[in-house]
Structure formats: structure tokens, C-alpha cells
Amino acid sequence: MSDNTLLLHTIMILDLEPNYNECRYCVRMLFNAVKFNNIRLVMHLLRNGVDPNFYDEYMRSPIHYAVEKGNTEMVKALLEHKADPNIFDDNFDYPITNSIIENKVEIVKILLQYGADKTMINEFDLLHDAIKNKHIDMAKILIDNGISLTMKDTDDYTPLHYAMLDNDTSVIYNLLDYIFKVKGYDVLGNIVHDILCNYDLYKETTLELLISYYIIISYLYRGIDLSDIYNSNIEILLNSKHLSDIKEKCENEIDVMKNAVICDGIAIIDLCTGYDANSIARNSVNLKRFSDTKLKIYRYYIEPIVEIGKYRRELLYNAINSMNEYCKSESNDIANWSCLPFEIKYKILENIKDDETLRKI
């Protein structure tokens, strides 16, 4: 149906002045307007009282079709007019589960905001599928909203198993880091435990990454409470020659990072946590050189920190150049900026903590 046909139907409705909530033509019109992404007609019908929870012969309501279309504006409009986010069709498909499976991140956020049932996400293997398909942003939303990280699928595997099996180190690191920061060390420990119990399924590189991340956390966050699951995991590592060799290599590199001091008198291990972007920026060149020459296992951990430093340093350099250009005119050089040494200019701008402010200079 074209927009012109929909418009004609709208005019007919307006002329007939029907009871919108009881008019079957109006309800059918709402379905068609949603299917054809006609937000103006949808809003007109909703404002005049058409029930957004009416369903068709497939038990599907307008919100099912809006989700299917991926139209965030339409989904939000329906929810604002009391569409039920937890309504299901004759296949027991829910708007929230469909949008998760189809990786419609913004729609999932909207559905959750308007009361979609969070318990539904544990009724299916949604996190398993998100990780299999490398939908990391979706996986993070599921983690934020309480999905079980140790739930096993029909093959008896937890979600992280599929990232490990795929040997995608970037995905594994992202997930481990996010789980630790959002859920804590104990939850991470339980996930690691399940992987270690099945370590023969995985490649050396992924096991190195998993074990190295788990071990370094206890060094970086010294106040962390090491629970029974930590001791159990260490015992598994020590009882396997293969795993204990990986553990030893990790600890040797950690010792190197503890003993290596760069130009600000800061140990590499300390620069990994607790220092601001300016400290990292000042030391990013030395940090990169150290990572390239001294590390093998923990290079993946240092590289993102180096990038933070490089970004901050480039931002400061660009801000200095912008200020230099602005102060070329004598009338603009109020604070005698042009007379200052580069090092002083750099130090002054370091005090601007907000990167957004620096970008505007």
C-alpha cells in the first residue's frame, strides 16, 4: 500500500469521524501504517485512541511489526501509547527476544526502558547466540540486565565457551574485561572455572589470554577479595602441567612489569591502573617500546593503554597548534601565549581534563 493510499484512508476516517478504538478499519489501518513505516499516520491513530495491543490472525500486535522493521521511532511511539512490550505471538516470539536475535541494539534499549520483562532473556540461549555472532554490544546489554553468565545451553556449554572456541582474542578480552568491571571478580572466577575444567577443548592462545587476564587482576587490584573460587582455579592450574606452564609465563611477565620503571618513575604494572590519561600520554612512547620488546603474553593488555596515551597526546598537540594559530594576531595574544615554551603550553593544557573541551580549542 502506497503512502497516497494510506493518506486517502486517513481522509476517509476523518470524514467518517468513527470511534477509533472500536473501528476495525482503524485497527487494520494501524497495522498497515506500521508495516509501511508511516509514522505520521501511526501517531494520528494512536492519539485518537486506537488500541496498540490489538493483534492479527497470527497473534502479532503492531509492536511486533515495528520491531521487525527496525523502526526505533515507531517502537517508541507505540510504547508511549501503552503498547505492551511483553506481548507474544502464536510462535511465542516476544519483541525483546526478536530484537536481541536480530541485533537491534537501540530497539532492545527502548524495550527495556519501557518495561520489557528482563527474565525473558534467561529463557533462551540469547547470550550464547550473541557471542557466536560476535554481537558484543548486544552481549554487554544482556550482561547489564542480569543474564546468567554461567547458564549452559543444550550442548552443556556456557556463553564464553563459544568465544574461546572461535579463538577470537579481541572478543574474549572484551568480554572478560567487561564481565570483571560490571559483575566483579567472583563472577569472572566462576566463568573461568568452567573453561579451565574443559581446557583441552581450546587453543593455546585463547587459554593464555584467559589465564593471563585472570591472574593479572589480582596484582592490579590488590584490595580485591580472593574467594574460594580463586583458590579452586589456582589449584586447577597447578594440577595440569600445560596450565601451570602458562601460569608461570604470566607471572614471569608480571614480574618484569613490576620491576620496569619508565621516565616518570612509575612502574609499568602501576601505569596499568590508577593513573590518569596525562601520565599515560607522557609515557606512551616508552610504554609502546617496552611492550614491543619485553612482553609477549601481556602485550594485548598494554596496547589499549598505549592508545589512550597516544590519543591524549595528539589531542594536546592539536590544541597547542590551534592556540598558536589563534594567538598569531597580537590582539588575541592576551596572556603572551606565543612567548611561552612548548613544554609550558603543554603543561597548561594538561590541566584541561575534559577531552571534549580540548577538541573545541
From Swiss-Prot:
InterPro entries, per database record: Ankyrin_rpt, Ankyrin_rpt-contain_sf, PRANC_domain
Domain of life assignment: Viruses
Keywords from the named record: ANK repeat, Repeat
Positions of ANK repeats: 25-54, 58-87, 91-120, 122-151, 155-184
The name this protein goes by in its record: Putative ankyrin repeat protein FPV227
Organism field: Fowlpox virus (strain NVSL)
Lineage: Viruses, Varidnaviria, Bamfordvirae, Nucleocytoviricota, Pokkesviricetes
